[in-house]
């Protein structure tokens, strides 16, 4: 739903998470107490044929973003620090593949990435966690599975499955 894009509470800023200068300006201008990182290169198959983009966005980009956010956080007064959270949206792909009889993944599972995509997301998770452990930056890491929504690329699992079902094609399992 893009109708709310015209709401005065919404501001769209085109940028790159690797642009520390831009991120710093945004933080100084808006003074957020919550930051959510949805930025990522996400297609497993594309990572196999072109991993560099995944490394640059998911690892280097996440590092530059969280490093800039940490500098912002360290300058906050104690009251604002109490309310600050950095939410890093990751993937269940960091845990590897499940066999048919295996129990579902939990946060206690060890990382076992199987592709450049999942390795880049696992690396970014470790970077984020290290900023919590080293600098005390409050972070939350989620390991979502097959997110979907409007305007999603049709090769992603949920839209691909739906399109195959309504056109009576084979559905992947």
Protein language model features and the residues they cover:
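Glycine/proline-rich active-site loop of Rossmann-fold NAD(P)-dependent oxidoreductases
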Residues: 122, 147-160, 167-169, 173
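N-terminal Rossmann-like NAD(P)+-binding domain of SDR-like oxidoreductases, especially those catalyzing
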Residues: 1-147
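C-terminal substrate-binding subdomain of Rossmann-fold SDR/epimerase-dehydratase oxidoreductases
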Residues: 7, 11, 15-18, 159, ...
């Amino acid at each position: 739903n893009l109708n709310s894009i015209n709401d005065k509470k919404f501001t769209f800023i085109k940028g790159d998470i690797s642009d520390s200068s831009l991120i710093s300006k945004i933080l100084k201008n808006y003074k957020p107490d919550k930051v959510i990182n949805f930025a990522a290169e996400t297609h497993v198959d594309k990572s196999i044929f072109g991993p560099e983009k995944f490394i640059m966005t998911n690892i280097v980009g996440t590092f530059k973003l969280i490093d800039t956010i940490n500098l912002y956080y360290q300058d906050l007064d104690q009251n604002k620090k109490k309310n600050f959270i950095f939410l890093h949206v990751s993937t269940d792909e960091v845990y590897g593949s499940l066999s048919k009889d295996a129990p579902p993944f939990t946060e206690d599972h060890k990382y076992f990435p199987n592709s450049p995509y999942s390795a880049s997301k696992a690396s970014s998770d470790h970077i984020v966690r290290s900023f919590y452990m080293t600098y005390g930056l409050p972070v939350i890491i989620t390991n979502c599975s097959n997110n979907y929504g409007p305007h999603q690329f049709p090769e992603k699992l949920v839209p691909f499955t739906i399109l195959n079902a309504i056109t009576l094609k084979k559905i992947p399992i």
